[in-house]
Amino acid sequence: MATDPRQLLVTCALPYANGSIHLGHMLEHIQADIWVRYQRLRGNTVNFICADDAHGTPIMLKAQQMGITPEEMIAAVSEEHQKDFAGFDISFDNYHSTHSEENRELASHIYLELKKNGFISSRTISQLFDPEKEMFLPDRFVKGTCPKCKSEDQYGDNCDNCGETYSPTELINPKSAVSGATPVMKDSEHFFFDLPQFESMLKEWTRSGSLQNETANKMQEWFESGLQQWDISRDAPYFGFEIPGEKDKFFYVWLDAPVGYMASFKNLCDKRDDLNFDEYWKKDSTTELYHFIGKDIVYFHSLFWPAMLEGAGFRKPNNVFVHGYVTVNGAKMSKSKGTFIKASTYLNHLDPECLRYYYAAKLNSRIDDLDLNLEDFTQRVNADVVNKIVNLASRNAGFITKRFEGKLSAEFAEPELYNEFVAAAERIGQLYETREFSRAIREITALADKANQYIDEKAPWVLAKEEGKEKELQEVSSVGINLFRVLMAYLKPVMPELAARTEAFLNEELTWEAIATPLTDHEITKFKALFSRIDPKKVEAMIESSKEDAAAEAAAKEKAEAEKEQASQTELDKEPIADEIEFDAFSAVDMRIARIISCEEVPKANKLLKFQLDIGGETRQVFSGIKSAYKPEELEGKLTVMVANLKPRKMKFGMSEGMILAAGPGGSDLWILEPHEGAQPGMRVM
């Protein structure tokens, strides 16, 4: 009995808009995309959305470092992110930004509803404050010495060396990571969401059975330790949305970030006539809402987010699907080893469908970390996709196109074998539905083994050489093509590009329902290579490219930090005051006001300018090494200061009878001293 199509809204966690997409991000987006494509293949209506998380202190500060506005930076990052996701065939219906009018309106509406319903309170708190930048400092923007193990240069919330967690006020010798200044404590009024009021609802939601066991168990730990009020405000300066009715107070990024799911969908609804925002988000909605996220943000999605929605009168998610981290070759991704691989770097070297297949072959419904072993990656894709599945088509297609004008046999020779393949649809479909992708892939490759075993036993290449075996040859090859068709229908959510090429080859769209009946008396097209095996040299080239990218980033960061440090230095830091001298030593130096009569370049001298100076009744010739700072014509007629009693010095280009005084580090950064109006040539400088 046919059932009505399900209506689903599916989201991926919003990538932060201050960096590139890497293969860790891609695990989640590939996992979600496979699930979404399966749902669409089964006739369900899916709206698949995402957005950039575009607010917060890190974005504000990075834009400042780049010398551009936050808006300019997040626009460029959004373009890069969307290009990367498109490169991996992530089939979003809409990709938006949390820095949007839709998000401003929805975040403000939710806040005001929570406030009206008694879930918002305020109180004064003390925080570390950067006196130079005049800004409150998030924990990660304070650095100092760990209070436990005494390791230096540790963040304000935890120690990378010993793992200790602490508050930034416990750091020894804390410094602002923004300016290097010593922070001070300062009071500020902050606004809080009263999460403990939702404990009963959250416990009931946890016990509903829809959450993963690991997530439900973790939530139980949080309940046992006690829920706390959540600080939802930040002080100016801050890149984000101002809190309605408050001056210089902004929503903390984690308040408006999940609202970005709603905003992206609202943006999609405004583009289409067939979607209704309230139908998907009203409290009694019959549509389904699913979030795919990483295990590092479970706290926000399983506690704060459903509580915010409940408190503001919206529906809650049906489920939050959580995945683990990506490791490479058994270890944390490393920039120095070249295993911190950006999505764009991967796309420059390898087929995205290879990674889609490999991730699918290792993904399950649990919160397990996934290891991208690059040697296994190469071997598995080549063995499974090329040798088992695509090879099934290539070893049979030639006989059909060359001997039978591309026509499959009129009768299907192996109905029992075919029915066995079709019967697997229910099992494989259920595995896709429950996100047990690795088990689905094992089912598919086991069928591929069986199909190849059949072809090996029937040996069409032998039949092709025997007279009178034409009918059997056509039937055997047609069975091989049809079994390949079933396998590719099952693989379509994982490898959409390979599926599209297969559809062109078969002259037929791959659908879940159509495979119930084999293709007979059907014309296929001439076989072309459908998929290329992975060349290990390309994997090595990708690793080397990642190392080069990391080295370039490190060099740029080092340069920026050096420039930042130099900019924070005073002139006295750069060149400390010299040792004290007696007054008599100073008074021995005779400095006079001089008017520059003429100034000209010295032929064959890289640094020198030649001056004629009027010092009040006497003209002096002086050579000065300020050529890189001034053009001669800029100086003529100006008053300056010279040392008049310096012993004349014979130079290659003539006699220098004194010294012009200038300030600055050198090169083009030099400035001659100029007295105020009223000073006259010859006057002594005291």
From Swiss-Prot:
The keyword Lipid metabolism does not apply. HAMAP family: Met_tRNA_synth_type1. It comes from the Bacteria. Residues 550-571 are annotated as: Disordered. NCBIfam families: metG, metG_C_term, PRK00133.1. ATP binds at residue 335. Pfam families: Anticodon_3, tRNA-synt_1g, tRNA_bind. GO terms for biological process: methionyl-tRNA aminoacylation. Zn(2+) binds at residues 146, 149, 159, 162. Its EC number is 6.1.1.10. Its cofactor is Zn(2+). It catalyses: tRNA(Met) + L-methionine + ATP = L-methionyl-tRNA(Met) + AMP + diphosphate. GO terms for cellular component: cytosol. A motif ('KMSKS' region) lies at residues 332-336. Residues 585-686 form the tRNA-binding domain. It is found in: Cytoplasm. This is Methionine--tRNA ligase. The keyword Cytoplasm applies. Homodimer. A motif ('HIGH' region) lies at residues 15-25. Belongs to the class-I aminoacyl-tRNA synthetase family. MetG type 1 subfamily. Is required not only for elongation of protein synthesis but also for the initiation of all mRNA translation through initiator tRNA(fMet) aminoacylation. Its main location: cytoplasm.
